[in-house]
A protein has these predicted regions:
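Core alpha/beta catalytic barrel or barrel-like domain that forms the active/cofactor pocket
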Residues: 1, 24-34, 123-129
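N-terminal active-site beta-alpha-beta segment that forms phosphate/nucleotide-binding
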Residues: 1-10
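An acidic, phosphate/nucleotide-engaging active-site surface
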Residues: 9-73
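Conserved, well-structured core segments that form the ligand-binding/active-site neighborhood
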Residues: 48-173
Length: 174
């Protein structure tokens, strides 16, 4: 869904992070084409990127961090990369149809559906500190992602910047 929900925009987003074909040593295939891999019990379709679906194997990589719009055991991270990143625009629209209130609850349910019906092999979780520096890296086999990601998120939240006052009075004069 990033990059303006276009294949070209997604490549530009990756390039902004220094992830290029030259850096990787392989082609970057980007498209907005998806495959419906199944439906949830409530009838909601689950989508994944067509290229990823056809790949021999998938390794997800994502920064695990607090989300700005919702809280839960899964926020921004490997599960969200599977659900919204691999789901492309169609997947993002399906997931967001009930608003952010349900997103924290739905991420692990949809991620499990994806893990069970695609060739996701592993995930690489990246955590940052208060200075936006990578300070934690953990690899997880696909069967470990749902169990390990909440603890990884907790550890990244511990490294965020914070104001070290329990009680503070502030006077602002203009």
């Amino acid at each position: 869904s990033h990059g303006g929900a276009t294949a070209e925009g997604q490549v530009e987003t990756l390039t902004g992070y220094g992830v290029t074909e030259d850096f990787l040593g392989c082609p970057i295939k980007s498209s907005m084409d998806t495959v419906e891999i199944g439906r949830l019990d409530n009838g909601q379709p689950v989508y994944v990127d067509k290229y990823a679906y056809e790949a021999d194997g998938i390794i997800l990589c994502g920064r695990v961090k607090a989300h700005t719009a919702f809280r839960g055991p899964y926020e921004s991270g490997v599960c969200k990369m599977a659900v919204i990143g691999m789901g492309k625009q169609k997947g993002a629209e399906a997931v967001h149809r009930d608003g952010f209130y349900e997103l924290g609850k739905m991420l692990p349910i949809i991620a499990k559906k994806i893990f069970d019906n695609t060739k996701v092999m592993a995930g690489l979780a990246l955590g940052e500190n208060a200075f936006d520096q990578t300070c934690l890296i953990e690899s997880m086999l696909v069967e470990e992602i749902l169990d390990k990601e909440p603890d990884f998120l907790r550890r990244t939240k511990e490294r965020l910047g914070k104001i070290y006052f329990d009680n503070i009075d502030v006077l602002v004069v203009e």
